[in-house]
Each structure stands twice: as structure tokens, then as C-alpha cells.
């Protein structure tokens, strides 16, 4: 069920993109992304990179925490009614997926708190790799120019981040932090989670200002295209 719903999410968003911009070839763009990006932990490893099944499920909870927050932010920010409905349904699905993985991990052998924290922090850190930046590059580069126009990871990451931070609000961050906290055995509104939310939100506001300035400079130089968000 989880896998089918994730596929449906992609199909629904692809359909909306085609209606919003008929010139955008989603299939070719997605194929280019798949051809150009492979998660580092998929290379040469047939086993669990988290060390255990519970570790894998914690990592999945982290992912679902982020996607729930992300689609909730899009839902609250957009005024386009079809997109609002689509991302609202997706946000609800992602929350249920988080609950599924959380329930499944409870049946697995327990890990120490520090081990769970390390797994969660490691999965959060993977969001800083090429995945999102390269997705932005593929989505914003003419299909015939992908692989020809240079891929500037740093510029693409900043451009993507700028769009994300424009729609993110404190309540979205608090939800994500709370869900991650529960996944590793912490209280979602405990002092650690609250402190982390405040600290991260302060960093978010700083990065938003910095990213918007960087975007303006890039646009002025005719650099990274800014028309679409990945």
C-alpha cells in the first residue's frame, strides 16, 4: 500500500505539472534525473546501511517527517485549488506512512538512544547531498541541455532551498521535529524538541535571507534558472 501510494503521489504531481506547464516533459526530466543520480548508499551495498531493520525504519520515519512537513507547507502556501487539494492528500498519506514505519519499528529489537539519534541525524544529513540539488538542476534545465549545461551543485542547492524556506513556517518545522523526536523515543514537545525547533528556526530565518540574496545575484548574472521548483 505504501509503495503504491508513493507512486500515486508522483503521478498526481506530474499530472498537475503538465496542466500547469504543458511544455514541461516530466517523463524525460525524471529519466534524466534517475540516470544522473544514485544515492551513495545504494552503490555496492546489498545490506542495511543503518545496521539493523529498526534503524532502517527510523530512517524512513525521518523521511516521512520531512515530507509531511514539506507538503503541509505547500498546502498552506498555495492558492491554486487543485494543487492545494493534491498536496493536502499527500501530506495526509505521508503522515500515515510515518505511523506505519513507527509501528513496525516497535516490533524490532531496541537500540540505544544515542544510536537512534545518530541514525536520525545521519538521514537528515543525507538531504544535503546531491539528490535535491540535482533534481532542481534537471527540473530547471531544458531537457536537451541536461548534461551539457554545467551542474553547479552549490547554486542549485541554494535555489531549491530558497523556495522551500519561503513556504516553511514555524508550525511546519515543529511538526517535523516532533515526529522525528517520537521516532527516536523522545517527547515531541519536550524541552529538547522545543529547543531544537527554536534553534533551527533561527537558522532557517538566517538562511532564508542569505539564500534570497544569493538567488538575486545568480539571476542578475543569468545563472541558475529560477522558473520552476524541483
Spans of model-derived segments:
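Non-heme di-metal
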Residues: 1-230
Amino acid at each position: 500500500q505504501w509503495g503504491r501510494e508513493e507512486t500515486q503521489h508522483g503521478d498526481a504531481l506530474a499530472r498537475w505539472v503538465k496542466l500547469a506547464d504543458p511544455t514541461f516533459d516530466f517523463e524525460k526530466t525524471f529519466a534524466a534525473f534517475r540516470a544522473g543520480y544514485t544515492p551513495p548508499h545504494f552503490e555496492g551495498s546489498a545490506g542495511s546501511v543503518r545496521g539493523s531493520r529498526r534503524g532502517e525504519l527510523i530512517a524512513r520515519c525521518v523521511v516521512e517527517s520531512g515530507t509531511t512537513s514539506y507538503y503541509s507547507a505547500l498546502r498552506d502556501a498555495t492558492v491554486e485549488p487543485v494543487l492545494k487539494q493534491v498536496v493536502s492528500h499527500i501530506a495526509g498519506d505521508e503522515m500515515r506512512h510515518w505511523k506505519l514505519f513507527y509501528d513496525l519499528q516497535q516490533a524490532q529489537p531496541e537500540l540505544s538512544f544515542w544510536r537512534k539519534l545518530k541514525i536520525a541525524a545521519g538521514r537528515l544529513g543525507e538531504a544535503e547531498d546531491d539528490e535535491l540539488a540535482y533534481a532542481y538542476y534537471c527540473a530547471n534545465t531544458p531537457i536537451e541541455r541536461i548534461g551539457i549545461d554545467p551542474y553547479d551543485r552549490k547554486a542549485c542547492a541554494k535555489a531549491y532551498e530558497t523556495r522551500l524556506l519561503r513556504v516553511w513556517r514555524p508550525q511546519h518545522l515543529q511538526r517535523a521535529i516532533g515526529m522525528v523526536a517520537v521516532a527516536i523515543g523522545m517527547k515531541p514537545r519536550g524541552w529538547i524538541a522545543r529547543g531544537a525547533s527554536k534553534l533551527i528556526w533561527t537558522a532557517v530565518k538566517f538562511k532564508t535571507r542569505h539564500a534570497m540574496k544569493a538567488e538575486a545575484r545568480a539571476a542578475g548574472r543569468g545563472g541558475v534558472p529560477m522558473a520552476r521548483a524541483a
